[in-house]
Amino acid sequence: MAKVEMYATRVCPYCSMAEALLRSKGIEPNKTLVDVNTEERARMRERAGGRHTVPQIFINGDHIGGFDELKALDQAGNLDPLLQTAAEG
């Protein structure tokens, strides 16, 4: 299974929807709360090319984007193959 990382906040509805979508696929994302950790928020922005909105999702270290991008991947049939790949490293 893929390694999925998600930067989120506790009160973000899009974060909750992204987490629910991933869980429906059998994936428990490694979630980092950036509303309580400013160092992690800065790291998220660096990894996400300056994007500051949440969620920011990474699969096997590759930046996917936010919930809209995750949902679009799923609707196009491209999310499941990504999630089936073995985590690298």
List PLM regions with ranges.
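Structural micro-motif
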Residues: 49-58, 68
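Residues that form or flank phosphate/diphosphate-binding pockets in enzymes
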Residues: 16, 39, 65
